[in-house]
Amino acid sequence: MSSDDLSLYFNEIVNNVNFRIKNFVKSNFKTLEEASFHLFTAGGKRLRPLVLVSSSDLIGGDRERAYKAAAAVEILHNFTLVHDDIMDNDGLRRGLPTVHVKWGEPMAILAGDYLHAKAFEALNEALKGLDGNTFYKAFSIFITSIEIISEGQAMDMSFENRLDVTEEEYIQMIKGKTAMLFSCSAALGGIINKANDDVVKKLTEYGLNLGISFQIVDDILGIIGDEKELGKPIYSDIREGKKTILVIKTLSEATEDEKKILVSTLGNKEAKKEDLERASEIIRKHSLQYAYDLAKKYSDLAIENLREIPVSNKTAEKALKYLAQFTIQRRK
């Protein structure tokens, strides 16, 4: 299969999911609808919908159900982004002003709440006509995902005032904050098509490993990425005091003088550009390659998970492998 064929496959999924998102995210109150739909207008990679629909296709699943379930996870994802931007006080997302910057915090909180409700509405529509056990499994993993995402975000925030965060704690945090929704997406692709427990387990593991790899690369791009390409400020993780794998590794490897520079910049809202750049240089020196190698390890694990699933659709298999590889090759 050529890259053009895979691109057509992905575009078909994205267009169909976008159409359903637009139909779900409607409100009688215009301002609420605009604020809720704002981040969708800026595009986004739609990786979670691609994972869900490709996972469904992999086992010969129902496309219409998959599109609606994919809309549910993407709406849920955007809900978390709206609230994350408030918590992190970020002014840009995907090159656009964040919802709280454009409409104010009260409306942004309401928009997040509205998206949260709409995500459940979309999932409910996806599950219509299915038996009670399947309905229960799908809603259980969706609800559990929200709980674990919240716990992951809470862990991330709690790390900001610590310098002793371990790699194990970091991995646990990103499993919750980021990887859980990828895992949920892949699992739902199996659950809505009544896949057996072994298949759902392997899809779950695929999504989890892909999500861990994705977040590690996200943290890397926050240090070395291009601001215009990313659509958000670089160095914001340093300014916010985030304990990414790069910071954790650097603190364990750097000289005492380098540590002093890094610690004085971490979490310093008043840090100047040259301070942030110096801290970035120290991080690149000590942890950039390590972080890339770690991301590749989890990307490889995701691909390995796919080898244990009976395949009904070769295109979907290639798509899922590509998505795992894309996580470590992307520039935004």
Curated annotation (Swiss-Prot):
The Swiss-Prot or TrEMBL record lists the needed cofactor(s) as: Mg(2+)
> Which gene is this protein's source?
gds
From the Swiss-Prot or TrEMBL record, give the protein name.
Geranylgeranyl diphosphate synthase
The biological pathway it contributes to is: Isoprenoid biosynthesis; geranylgeranyl diphosphate biosynthesis; geranylgeranyl diphosphate from farnesyl diphosphate and isopentenyl diphosphate: step 1/1
Q: What class of enzyme is it?
A: transferase
What's the Enzyme Commission number for this chain?
Answer: 2.5.1.29
The positions annotated for binding Mg(2+) 1 are D84, D88
Where is isopentenyl diphosphate annotated to bind? K45, R48, H77, R94
According to the record, cofactor stoichiometry and binding are noted as: Binds 2 Mg(2+) ions per subunit.
Catalysed reactions, as listed in the record: isopentenyl diphosphate + (2E,6E)-farnesyl diphosphate = (2E,6E,10E)-geranylgeranyl diphosphate + diphosphate
Q: Which GO terms describe its biological process?
A: geranylgeranyl diphosphate biosynthetic process; isoprenoid biosynthetic process
